[in-house]
A protein has these predicted regions:
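Internal, conserved structured core segments that host functional sites
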Residues: 13-55, 59, 80
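Conserved nucleotide- and phosphate/pyrophosphate-binding catalytic cores
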Residues: 43, 49-220
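N-terminal Rossmann-like or analogous alpha/beta NTP/dinucleotide-binding catalytic cores
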Residues: 1-24, 143, 179-184, 188, ...
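A short glycine/serine-rich beta->alpha loop
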Residues: 7-11, 34, 121
Length: 220
């Protein structure tokens, strides 16, 4: 999947072949039974399961075959980037980060793809390839509509009107911006609180690392 996404035809980096082994080690060392991930990671999980099966055939029942835990909402299983094309990826520069402040989120939302362009808001809108509506599908709630856009009861009502025309993409982006920032505000607050005690963060990481080493050592 990664090779296709990056359009590697030749001179494929060794990391593309070795990284699945490294990921499998991170999972199996702790005998994890469930791995929360997006559907783009399903091939990697299958590689891990195959490695576990072959290892256990040789050395006995030592490792555990993990299962993938996908988000309940199908749209969240492979959330596209803000460009509406590839998956959200740091290397592709199409991400909204949990650490982004409100101004940064709005800057990114304004640049989000609306799918097929329209000459005016009176023209019917298009949902296919429209990253704004994909994100609304993933994150908006009926309560968000009641708070920020009471003209519509829910996302389905907005969609019905949007495809008929009369709703500007800018208005939809403003609504999405409100939805995202409402969700991110508590995260920002908590992050700020932790930033005031960096030594404690390192202390937590140290304790976690020690516990992880102990667990992995038992498996090894």
């Amino acid at each position: 999947t990664e090779i296709k996404m990056r359009n590697f035809a030749a001179n494929i980096p060794l990391g593309c072949f070795c990284y699945p082994d490294s990921q499998a080690a991170d999972i199996t060392a702790f005998k994890a039974t469930t791995v929360p991930a997006g559907e783009d990671q399903e091939p990697m999980l299958e590689v891990t399961r195959e490695l576990v099966r072959r290892f256990n055939q040789t050395y006995g029942d030592v490792l555990v075959e993990p299962n993938i835990l996908l988000p309940e909402q199908a749209v969240c299983r492979r959330l596209p980037g803000t460009d509406g094309k590839e998956k959200m990826s740091k290397s592709l520069g199409n991400c909204i980060y949990l650490s982004d402040d409100a101004a940064t989120v709005w800057k990114k939302v304004k640049k989000m793809s609306n799918g097929e362009p329209r000459m005016s808001m009176e023209e019917p809108g298009h949902l296919e390839g429209n990253a704004v509506f994909t994100y609304l599908e993933a994150f908006s709630t009926d309560e968000d509509f009641a708070e920020f856009w009471p003209e519509f009861a829910n996302l389905e009502a907005l969609k019905q009107q949007y495809v008929q025309g009369g709703i500007g993409d800018g208005t939809c982006k403003k609504f999405l911006n409100n939805v995202l920032n409402k969700m991110l505000d508590p995260i920002r607050t908590r992050r700020h609180e932790w930033e005031q005690d960096i030594p404690e963060i390192f202390n937590i990481l140290k304790k976690g690392s020690e516990a992880a080493r102990e667990t992995a050592a038992k498996t090894m």
